[in-house]
UniProtKB/Swiss-Prot annotation:
Taxonomy, superkingdom: Bacteria
Function text: An accessory protein needed during the final step in the assembly of 30S ribosomal subunit, possibly for assembly of the head region. Essential for efficient processing of 16S rRNA. May be needed both before and after RbfA during the maturation of 16S rRNA. It has affinity for free ribosomal 30S subunits but not for 70S ribosomes.
UniProt protein name: Ribosome maturation factor RimM
GO molecular-function term, one example from the UniProt record: ribosome binding
Domain notes: The PRC barrel domain binds ribosomal protein uS19.
PANTHER family (UniProt xref): RIBOSOME MATURATION FACTOR RIMM (PTHR33692:SF1)
Species in which this protein is naturally found: Nitrobacter winogradskyi (strain ATCC 25391 / DSM 10237 / CIP 104748 / NCIMB 11846 / Nb-255)
Keywords for the protein's UniProt record, in alphabetical order: Chaperone, Cytoplasm, Ribosome biogenesis, rRNA processing
Gene name tied to this protein: rimM
Listed GO biological process terms: ribosomal small subunit biogenesis; rRNA processing
Family per similarity comment: Belongs to the RimM family.
Domain PRC barrel, first and last residues per copy: 92-165
Length: 173
């Protein structure tokens, strides 16, 4: 199966004719109109953004085949995905979150720490979540200082843990 990337989430209905609020996760919010049909997380449904206009922090979008408020309301919370190969190539030092998930994580000495489980953003910057083979996950700032090496082709990231993590000794990840 081709890797897919979540590019948008449908929000509440807007108006009476089936428009929806659409939160995009792309650099250019309007790019979701150019990807063609987008699929739901389970792949069971295809939805195409036929028209969109900018609102304060989201888009107001018309989805092909969605013509009533009731239909739009049923889509609230639906995540929309596109095949990874439809996305533009990234510049040096830029990554799609989907490309990082599953990479092996090592410390600077080469000791395995686990795998990249997720990338989060709770409003103060990106957080990289590392899942070790055993024990709780580790969440660290996704900065150049903490993650100095991202080698997608080599399937790994290097983590240089901050001096203290929850009161533990420096670099004792």
């Amino acid at each position: 199966m081709t890797a897919r990337v979540c590019v948008a989430r449908i929000g509440a209905a807007h108006g009476l004719r089936g428009e929806v609020r659409l939160w995009t996760f792309t650099e250019d919010p309007m790019s979701v109109t150019r990807y063609g049909p987008l699929s739901t997380k389970d792949g069971a449904r295809q939805l195409e953004v036929s028209h969109a206009r900018a609102a304060s922090d989201h888009l107001i979008a018309t989805l092909t085949g969605v013509t009533t408020r009731e239909e739009a309301e049923r889509l609230n919370g639906t995540e929309l995905y596109v095949a990874r190969d439809k996305l533009p190539e990234t510049d040096e030092g830029e990554f799609y979150h989907a490309d990082l998930i599953g990479l092996a994580a090592f410390d600077a000495a080469g000791t395995a720490l686990g795998t990249v489980a997720a990338i989060h953003n709770f409003g103060a910057g990106d957080i990289i979540e590392i899942a070790p083979a055993r024990g709780p996950t580790l969440m660290l700032p996704f900065t150049d200082a903490v993650v100095p090496i991202v080698d997608i082709a080599g399937g790994r990231v290097v983590i240089e843990a901050p001096a203290e993590i929850d009161g533990e000794e420096p670099n004792s990840v």
